[in-house]
Amino acid sequence: MHAVTRPTLREAVARLAPGTGLRDGLERILRGRTGALIVLGHDENVEAICDGGFSLDVRYAATRLRELCKMDGAVVLSTDGSRIVRANVQLVPDPSIPTDESGTRHRSAERAAIQTGYPVISVSHSMNIVTVYVRGERHVLTDSATILSRANQAIATLERYKTRLDEVSRQLSRAEIEDFVTLRDVMTVVQRLELVRRIGLVIDYDVVELGTDGRQLRLQLDELLGGNDTARELIVRDYHANPEPPSTGQINATLDELDALSDGDLLDFTALAKVFGYPTTTEAQDSALSPRGYRAMAGIPRLQFAHADLLVRAFGTLQGLLAASAGDLQSVDGIGAMWARHVRDGLSQLAESTISDQ
């Protein structure tokens, strides 16, 4: 076996989505009630496990794939899937590679996928299902109607999560303006941002598997998730326990730690607080915090991050920025009179609109 870069399961599923030539070929095979074994890639590693059959090297077509799969052997496609390289070959992967599959075709498919690193598809004629194996992972293709039903339910859940996220975000913004933020307020928003991100990933996988059938779902998902990644980054910039504004490396490390939390830990505010560098006691949740101001200034139109960063480093906190006059802001090296007035007006409008939303 060779440690080389190969397609991920997600990439393989995308190649088999409705609207693709491969999916058309698989649908024809299923309708014909015949089995199939298809290798999605060709190199010396694949050649090493191929026995018998014949070489073709012809342009891929769904009808050709269907006809060639009527024979007992496997079909090998080029790495980009544009050509059919070999047909009716017997795959003889290393029998010592462990597999949990029971059927001969599925066992060969899983072992071949692990040994070569290329996706291998097994079509069961008895169960009428398509399974794709990629480097020790397996995925059973599902019909679009079933996926759409599941994804629409997930979208409804995402909409509820997003509504709740918007509510707690507004509450945090009001607390920031009034200088009454607690660690619990911040962790509530962090939790909701992460919940939205996670269910979004689940739906995104369904969208990938749906292919052309998932276009409308993609539009809905993009609209609901718009700005979520930026919001996660901004809240880390504002509230990381580091005495100085966190570096890009610290921000990425914090977000990675959040991503790695279990669903159970995500419900525990003390676990979230630990990721941000705060004490993990329940009492600490009521401790007062002061935002740096990145999140608030992100709401000022046309304000570049470089300018916001200069101001945060000069004034330290959002309250310091709110108390500063245009002249104070202009005194910061790199902030001209025009930007100083723009920021001063933007912060004033932000404070007024936030309070009026109560």
From Swiss-Prot:
Subunit-structure text: Homooctamer.
Ranges for domain DAC: 6-144
Gene: disA
Record: residues binding ATP: G73, L91, T104, R105, H106, R107, S108
Catalyzed reactions per annotation: 2 ATP = 3',3'-c-di-AMP + 2 diphosphate
E.C. designation(s): 2.7.7.85
Organism: Mycobacterium bovis (strain ATCC BAA-935 / AF2122/97)
PROSITE patterns according to UniProt: DAC (PS51794)
Protein name per the record: DNA integrity scanning protein DisA
Known role: Participates in a DNA-damage check-point. DisA forms globular foci that rapidly scan along the chromosomes searching for lesions. Also has diadenylate cyclase activity, catalyzing the condensation of 2 ATP molecules into cyclic di-AMP (c-di-AMP). c-di-AMP likely acts as a signaling molecule that may couple DNA integrity with a cellular process.
Principal EC category: transferase
Keywords: ATP-binding, DNA damage, DNA repair, DNA-binding, Magnesium, Nucleotide-binding, Nucleotidyltransferase, Transferase
Pfam families: DAC, DisA-linker
